């Protein structure tokens, strides 16, 4: 006789597995980002800016799935530390663009060790991580579409 998994059993919940993995990532990243003097959300801001310096605040929020009420204080704290600067768009003054300062750009070299440490900790093949990341992107897209 086979028993069907209880759909309300915690360990059978996909959402709990993702939630628990998120917490494990946070614990793993914290000491590494503390050494850089930044938090995980700030790290994400830098990752976007290292790809697209001069992006608008709105585009940054869209890229990170965060609203302006979350992005603005994050950006202001980094600006106060001299790691980035905000500037009104020359063509549309309603838009604010975010630019890295030399100090913010310089943080990239130190941050390169973080994803390398993640890869080491996860072990396995790079393709495994790529496949998992793609599955998680698809999961987010499907949940967004169903919301």
Give the positions of each predicted feature.
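Charged, amphipathic alpha-helical coiled-coil/dimerization segments
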Residues: 26, 76-134
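Residues within helix-turn-helix
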Residues: 57-58, 69, 76, 96
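N-terminal leader segment of winged-helix/HTH proteins
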Residues: 1-36, 130, 134, 141
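Generic C-terminal helix-cap and adjacent flexible tail
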Residues: 141-147
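Amphipathic alpha-helical recognition patches that constitute DNA-binding helices
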Residues: 13, 44, 95
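Short helix-coil-helix linker/hinge
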Residues: 36-41, 70, 101, 125-127
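N-terminal helix-turn-helix DNA-binding core of bacterial DNA-binding proteins
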Residues: 16, 23, 27-67
């Amino acid at each position: 006789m086979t028993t069907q998994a209880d759909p309300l059993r915690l360990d059978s919940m996909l959402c709990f597995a993702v939630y628990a993995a998120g917490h494990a990532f946070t614990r793993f990243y914290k000491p590494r980002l503390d050494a850089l003097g930044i938090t995980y959300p700030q790290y994400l801001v830098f990752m976007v800016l290292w790809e697209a310096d001069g992006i608008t605040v709105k585009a940054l929020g869209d890229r990170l799935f965060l609203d302006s009420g979350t992005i603005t204080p994050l950006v202001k704290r980094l600006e106060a530390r001299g790691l980035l600067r905000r500037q009104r768009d020359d063509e549309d003054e309603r838009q604010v663009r975010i630019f890295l300062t030399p100090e913010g750009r310089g943080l990239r070299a130190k941050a390169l060790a973080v994803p390398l440490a993640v890869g080491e900790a996860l072990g396995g093949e790079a393709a495994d991580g790529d496949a998992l990341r793609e599955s998680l992107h698809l999961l987010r897209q499907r949940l967004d579409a169903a919301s």
